[in-house]
Regions:
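Short, basic, helix/turn surface patches
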Residues: 1, 178-180
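A structured beta-alpha segment of the ubiquitous adenosine-cofactor-binding alpha/beta core
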Residues: 1-21, 25
Length: 180
């Protein structure tokens, strides 16, 4: 338990570790690789972070279970609570289906109910830590600075029940590939 940097360094430099696998940010991967070389620990790194979901026109050939699963996949994978490091953080959508596809996605996102995860009426809980909440808040600010158009959400969620909780509104921004 603790900060990823401290724990990661300890694990990657420990003599009992026989293999390192990491998925995440490039600069962190470079650091892990440097540490792993100290004991010549085999390493597998998947770096980059901004892996997209790609949606082509064919997903809308029928308004069926497959189409619903495509929407659900985008919505649910994009709205974890900080526990999934392989989470796709953007979607590339074929232009001809963009409007009707996003209309359905936004409807689904608006149906997400934030709150205590022990309450079965809620569908999304808080972020897993204060640091994760702050990291996401920083990205929300960057998106605005980079000129992204907020389609839904885009802010810290304040609840009267838990005003200091680590909740973030489910958010979708529209932008371009050069955005951070």
């Amino acid at each position: 338990n603790g900060a990823g940097g401290k724990i990661g360094k300890h694990l990657v430099t420990h003599r009992d570790v026989k293999k390192v696998a990491f998925t995440g940010e490039t600069s962190t991967g470079q650091e892990i690789m440097r540490y792993a070389t100290e004991n010549i620990i085999p390493s597998t790194l998947e770096l980059g972070g901004k892996s997209p979901n790609v949606f082509f026109k064919s997903i809308m050939d029928a308004d069926d279970e497959f189409f619903d699963k495509a929407i659900e996949g985008l919505v649910l994978f994009a709205f974890n609570s900080g526990e999934v490091c392989t989470c796709p953080s953007r979607a590339l959508i074929e232009e001809s289906i963009y409007e009707p596809f996003m209309k359905r996605v936004i409807e689904r996102v608006k149906a997400i109910k934030l709150g205590n995860p022990l309450d079965t009426e809620n569908t999304m809980g808080a972020q897993n830590s204060f640091n994760q909440k702050e990291k996401i808040a920083k990205y929300l600010k960057i998106a605005k600075e980079d000129g992204a158009e907020c389609l839904v959400g885009g802010d810290i969620y304040h609840s009267s029940i838990n005003p200091d909780g680590f909740y973030i509104e489910p958010t979708i921004y529209k932008g371009h590939n050069k955005m951070r």
